[in-house]
Amino acid sequence: MAGSLVESEALQMGVRRLSSPLTSPVQAEVYFPRLTVPFCGHIKGGMRPGKKILIMGIVNLEPKSFDIRLTCGDSEDPAADIAIELRAEFADKQLLRNACVSGKWGEEESAIPYFPFIADQPFRVEIHCEHPRLRIFVDGHQLFDFYHRVETLSAINTIKINGDLQLTKLG
């Protein structure tokens, strides 16, 4: 979906004040056309330390996988850099993550204390941007940190979600 299409159809979600013990309150602003999957939406102002992204949804009844990507735009040719791809694989009970910068995938990370997603059940994913890393929480529990591979955080301005889930809220 072209960036201009996303912006022209965009609705502004209510702005919420979020705070962190490490930062002052920040505004979480995500613009999106509709909460349909596959989904592509614009992150106003890009990522920055203190910014948080909230994804709420329900896993499908018989899921194979789903993925959440934060990207530097939505270009297909050349492909936009992928700051993080979170991929939930249900057969192997893995939550994989990686980044693709200048067309090259980095080393995939897979270690997690447990697999947090259950078929036909709701979930809440929070992505907290900090200076050296993204902190990923699922249902209120921190699962892992993913250290930035894209240097310019403000360039990370698009969220893409695809796979076996229904979105209920994005903020």
From Swiss-Prot:
Name of the protein described by the UniProt record: Galectin-related protein
Q: Which Pfam families match?
A: Gal-bind_lectin
Tell me one GO molecular function of this protein: carbohydrate binding
Show the SUPFAM superfamilies listed in the entry.
Concanavalin A-like lectins/glucanases (SSF49899)
Alphabetized SMART domains for the sequence = Gal-bind_lectin, GLECT
Q: Which PROSITE patterns match?
A: GALECTIN (PS51304)
Its biological purpose? Does not bind lactose, and may not bind carbohydrates.
Q: Give the organism's phylogenetic lineage.
A: Eukaryota, Metazoa, Chordata, Craniata, Vertebrata
The membrane spanning regions, by residue number, are none
InterPro entries referenced in this protein's UniProt entry, alphabetically = ConA-like_dom_sf, Galectin-like, Galectin_CRD
Q: What gene is behind this protein?
A: lgalsl
> PANTHER family under this entry?
GALECTIN (PTHR11346), GALECTIN-RELATED PROTEIN (PTHR11346:SF98)
